[in-house]
Amino acid sequence: MKKQLKFKLLAITLISILATIGIGCDRIFTKPFQLPASAKQEPWPIQTGLRAGILRDNIPTVNRIVLVPDEATFLAAIQKWNLKGNWPILIEDKKYAPMFLQRFQPEEIVRLPSIKPQRPKNQKLQQLMLNSAAAAWNATDTQTLKAKWTQLGWEPPGVVITSENDPARSAAVALAAAHGQPLVFLEDNFGKPNDTLNNTQWKNLQLAVTKAVESTGFFYSQLADPIDTITIVRQLAVKYQSPEKPDEQLAVTDGLGRHPNGERWAAVGWIYGSEVRSIYQAMCAIFLDTETAMLYDSYPKEGNWGKYEMEEAASGLKTIGLNVEVVQKPESSLEKWRSLASKPWTFDLILMNSKGYPKSFQVGNGDASVEDLPKLQFPAAIHMIHSWSAAAPDDKNTVAGRWLENGAYAYIGSVNEPFLSAFIPPKLMVDRLKRGAPFLIAARQLESPPWKVATIGDPLMSIAKPRPRIPPTQQPM
């Protein structure tokens, strides 16, 4: 009897030890950056947002801002990012850096002197950029970076494409580092931002982008595989000639990321411009939280216009904690708009329903001009239901151009006459945002053939819960 009791006690002890070992092994072999199996049942836009959310949850933001005088110092500074924390780094100027500072409100501001020499001896620029992006993941180069991702269970949600000869190139490094994406280079000439590509140029761009994504070695050809976004960070044309209707132009950011039959395999965002502004746009997308919103509706309540009403969208944004201001008919008018625009706006998110042309937009009972657009005190993400606003986004005398010049870091607008149905109704867009879909993806007609809505900004930027911050003392430079 005593022997049986001893045997039972021994068996219970052994089972307990094995269970403890099993739990310990689970902890050892758990991959902290892996997308949970349950998430893979979600639609691909939600999966993409959840991937970005994994990094927000696991890599805290250090409550500091680093200001640098030039690009070389920026690339040196970004190599201090790591898996224990990262922080905004901007090239100091008199316009965009102050806007970011005022909105971010850091506990610590660090100004770095210009580094000498500007680049390590015998190191090529592309290699420096790749190594700088890898350093944020405690890796030294592309090879060790991929090994680190495998170790952590991380699957990149997208690819960043830039040119080593483009002033926006350092923003590409930041987006690759922050979102855990491969960085690849595309050096050909594909036009200037206000241009229209002809059929030959467009086919060349499509092929070049697809080859660039293929070169990473990650699966990309279907939605909900790892690569579902492309971030182009360099100069190229905003639109291309429609193959079916030569007098119509389609949005390059909607035409890319598709198979020859038009089926989508990725959503595309685009950042271009000076090194100062492009880095600013990248840092806004990575680090800024969304707490306030302006919803301006100039549409009548009747007919199809009524489907684009803003009240339900406003209610949805309030449920995720945003402070929302709504202006709609009969209140929306030229007088009301000019009153609102008479002082700088502090809204993080701006959703607007309008009609018009590249240089004018309807605000209720009349047309406002580009000169009536408000200054921005804080950076903003903007969705503009309107025709032609993004036809020439590098021209500050157009609607999109002025919003971007004023400090918008993400912008959704049309390059041509798109018709109302090209845009997602605000309620549906907000429903997608609430579920975690990134901003640019939430605004897309995801099943339609290539059309006319351009998406400018980081395609992984989400309207998400505030990022956790840690004090600078926990992560010294």
Kindly give the residue locations of the regions a language model identified:
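Bacterial N-terminal signal peptides that target proteins for export
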Residues: 2-11
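Bacterial N-terminal signal peptides
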Residues: 11-20
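Glycine-rich loop/turn
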Residues: 55-68, 153-154, 158-162
